[in-house]
Amino acid sequence: MRIKIFMLVTAVVLLCCSGVATAAPKTYCEELKGTDTGQACQIQMSDPAYNINISLPSYYPDQKSLENYIAQTRDKFLSAATSSTPREAPYELNITSATYQSAIPPRGTQAVVLKVYQNAGGTHPTTTYKAFDWDQAYRKPITYDTLWQADTDPLPVVFPIVQGELSKQTGQQVSIAPNAGLDPVNYQNFAVTNDGVIFFFNPGELLPEAAGPTQVLVPRSAIDSMLA
């Protein structure tokens, strides 16, 4: 009898253990059908109609937001590439990424900034930025609104710095309409660093589209009192 009871208990334990050993959840790189090299997530797809090359960091705290953006961008591109008439050259989608960090109190931050190049049958190829920022202390995304302390108005300080730096970059005096330079909509892509905040501007936001994408570091010394 004791032997039978022992065998029954052993069988139950083995059955329970086998149920626990479930497959590990997929990483966001696996969800995107990419290859994780340990340092980067590489996604490559090719067809006579298109080429896709995407390079992302292996890890980012807000993986779901990054995954959703990449999936939507890729799927929209594929829809255009596969529904268009044949071309001499395939459509191109190239996405590269750069990471930024800040360790200055009261909160550490981490950011991923994507540079998205698309040649999808338009008059000209386009290159745009998309930034994702993460608050390490509060474990949540940082938006333009939560970047700043409440009841502050940073753009009257930020805009002249941006305009001056863009003039230096272009080698000529840049004139930006105040309604564009003071519009928070144009400052949604940014990365916080120890030195300040880098703002990334897409073509047509502050400068004409022909100027392409631009970026400006606004020194921390100019805005530190307004940062949240």
Curated annotation (Swiss-Prot):
Please list the GO biological process terms of this entry.
cellular response to starvation
Where is it located? Secreted
| Keyword flag Cytoplasm | no
Listed GO cellular component terms? extracellular region; peptidoglycan-based cell wall
Q: Which residues form the signal peptide?
A: 1-23
Record has Secreted as a keyword: yes
The alphabetical list of record keywords is: Secreted, Signal
Task: List the InterPro entries.
Answer: DUF3298 (IPR021729), Esterase_Immunogenic_RsiV (IPR053421), PdaC/RsiV-like_sf (IPR037126)
Give the source's domain of life in one word.
Bacteria
GO MF terms here are: zymogen binding
In which broad location class does this protein mainly occur, judging by the first location in its UniProt entry?
A: secreted
The family classification in the record reads: Belongs to the RsiV family.
Q: What is this protein called?
A: Immunogenic protein MPT64
- Organism field: Mycobacterium tuberculosis (strain ATCC 25618 / H37Rv)
What gene codes for this chain? mpt64
